[in-house]
């Protein structure tokens, strides 16, 4: 966002040098500003505080108007640190909301909440900007057709399919593979759908944001040689930023994604990590603005704020935004207002399991805990639905038998249960898959598996046709033909050893 008030561009009006406002009160990241009569800014307008601090360094702080207080005063929330600000400093109304660069030039770059690049790669090569505040698409613009968003990841497509233009909650602790799964989805949407991705880092660790950027460069998701060939734009408002920046960075990322959907007519993946931090920042701002807190100390406008973000994430007749949102659950309490409000908007949940991660099953998506509203016969078809249900039943029965196996051993099971356990172990291994973005670590080429191939593979395992193959043959392969080929190779190797 350009904050020189005499310059046009970046969605900020060309303004004459007019009588500015003055800072009259500073409470942490919240400022009260007095304007001359008749010159009051609108709600959500961007203000710029200009001046010099006590050692003569220039100050340029962007703020957003949140309340009109009367007596020609407004209350605004700062988007960067307010260190060095003093009462009486000049404040200029830009006449428009915060506006950020959009379009292909944003790919491969890292931005802050104001749309300023923070990756030391120079200015963004675009004059196209969009305001971060806008209405959700009108009902008549929406594409209400229910369609599956194929990811090429077997466990997701079969058991908890994503809806095109839907919202997915990604649940998982530290180190279970959220980042790798996110990068694989970014890679696959670019290859299979010709789509792009936008990653919004909302209130998470700066180190994690840096690690993600480095891993994306290493795996080719961000192309260092030709930045225009990159598949993702990154927008960061990390946990050291003021609450205003953390509250608005999700909208900045969403605005960039909306341009790809509405103007470029592409399918877009929008990642938000972490949606809880968006609510948390809103809660901090709400208290500073003097609003009465609601349940558990959250802001009274919690549902409205969440709705204004989530309702813009949808499919239109031009394209779609499919959003994957990491959800932190405070104290593992699912009834906490923040996660409870988030759940109301989700179409699917992808739960990552530390137990599967310990077994070496990657991706470590829990097939029994992950859910989707799309897994209905009228949407996915009878064949897909039946196969998914039989896979879940087999895995559920295996889970129930594990205590007996641990105490008494496999030999104490009935013949029928032994067969079921063998098939369940094959299914568990067949749900694993080599990822394109993990090639540099594993040395094995990544695999994109179409939905029809996935269904065929699991049907063959369930039917018993592959009972004679060793379970190791199903581990980290793509489709079922690769599993049978791997079984033959394993047999040849064992024969050679003999």
Swiss-Prot record:
Reaction catalysed by this enzyme: ATP + H2O + 4 H(+)(in) = ADP + phosphate + 5 H(+)(out)
Signal peptide coordinates: none
Keyword terms, alphabetized: ATP synthesis, ATP-binding, CF(1), Chloroplast, Hydrogen ion transport, Ion transport, Membrane, Nucleotide-binding, Plastid, Thylakoid, Translocase, Transport
Molecular function terms, GO-annotated: ATP binding; ATP hydrolysis activity; proton-transporting ATP synthase activity, rotational mechanism
Pfam families cross-referenced by the UniProt entry: ATP-synt_ab, ATP-synt_ab_N, ATP-synt_VA_C
Keyword Translocase: yes
Subcellular location: Plastid, Chloroplast thylakoid membrane
Binding residues annotated for ATP, in chain numbering: 172-179
Residue intervals passing through the bilayer: none
UniProt superkingdom: Eukaryota
Role summary: Produces ATP from ADP in the presence of a proton gradient across the membrane. The catalytic sites are hosted primarily by the beta subunits.
Listed name of the protein: ATP synthase subunit beta, chloroplastic
Organism lineage: Eukaryota, Viridiplantae, Streptophyta, Embryophyta, Tracheophyta
Gene name of the encoded protein: atpB
């Amino acid at each position: 966002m350009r904050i020189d008030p005499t310059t046009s561009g970046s969605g900020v009006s060309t303004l004459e040098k007019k009588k500015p406002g003055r800072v009259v009160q500073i409470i942490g990241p919240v400022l009260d500003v007095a304007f001359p009569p008749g010159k009051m800014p609108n709600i959500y307008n961007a203000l710029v505080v200009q001046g010099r601090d006590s050692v003569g360094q220039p100050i340029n702080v962007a703020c957003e108007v949140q309340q009109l207080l009367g007596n020609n005063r407004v209350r605004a929330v700062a988007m960067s640190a307010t260190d060095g600000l003093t009462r009486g400093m000049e404040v200029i109304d830009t006449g428009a909301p915060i506006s950020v660069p959009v379009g292909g030039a944003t790919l491969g770059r890292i931005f802050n909440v104001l749309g300023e690049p923070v990756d030391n790669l120079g200015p963004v090569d675009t004059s196209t900007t969009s305001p971060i505040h806008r209405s959700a698409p009108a009902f008549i613009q929406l594409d209400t057709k229910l369609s599956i968003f194929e990811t090429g990841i077997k466990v997701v497509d079969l058991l908890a399919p994503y809806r095109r233009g839907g919202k997915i909650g990604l649940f998982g602790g530290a180190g279970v593979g959220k980042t790798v799964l996110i990068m694989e989805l970014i890679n696959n949407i670019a290859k299979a759908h010709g789509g792009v991705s936008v990653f919004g880092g909302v209130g998470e660790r700066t180190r994690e944001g840096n690690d993600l950027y480095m891993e994306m460069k290493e795996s080719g998701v961000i192309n260092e040689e030709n930045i225009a060939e990159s598949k993702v734009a990154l927008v960061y408002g990390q946990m050291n930023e003021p609450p205003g920046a953390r509250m608005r960075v999700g909208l900045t990322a969403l605005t960039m994604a909306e341009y790809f959907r509405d103007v470029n007519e592409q399918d877009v993946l929008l990642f938000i990590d972490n949606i809880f931090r968006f609510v948390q920042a809103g809660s901090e701002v709400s208290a500073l603005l003097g609003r009465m807190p609601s349940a558990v100390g959250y802001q009274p406008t919690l549902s409205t704020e969440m709705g204004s973000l989530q309702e813009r994430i949808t499919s239109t007749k031009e394209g779609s935004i499919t959003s994957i949102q990491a959800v932190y659950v405070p104290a593992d309490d699912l009834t906490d207002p923040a996660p409870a409000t988030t759940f109301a908007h989700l179409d699917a949940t992808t739960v990552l399991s530390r137990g599967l991660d310990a077994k070496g099953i990657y991706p470590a998506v829990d097939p029994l805990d992950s859910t989707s509203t799309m897994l209905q016969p009228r949407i996915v078809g009878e064949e897909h639905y039946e196969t998914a249900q039989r896979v879940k039943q087999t895995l559920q029965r295996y889970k129930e038998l594990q205590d007996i196996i641990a105490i008494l051993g496999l030999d104490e099971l009935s013949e029928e249960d032994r067969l079921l356990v063998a098939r369940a172990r094959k299914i568990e291994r067949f749900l694993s898959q080599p990822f394109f973005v993990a090639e540099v670590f594993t040395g094995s080429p990544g695999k994109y598996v179409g939905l029809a191939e996935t269904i065929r593979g699991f049907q063959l395992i369930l039917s018993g046709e592959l009972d004679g193959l060793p379970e190791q043959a199903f581990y980290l392969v793509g489709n079922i033909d690769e599993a049978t080929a791997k079984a033959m190779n394993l047999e040849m190797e064992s024969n050679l050893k003999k």
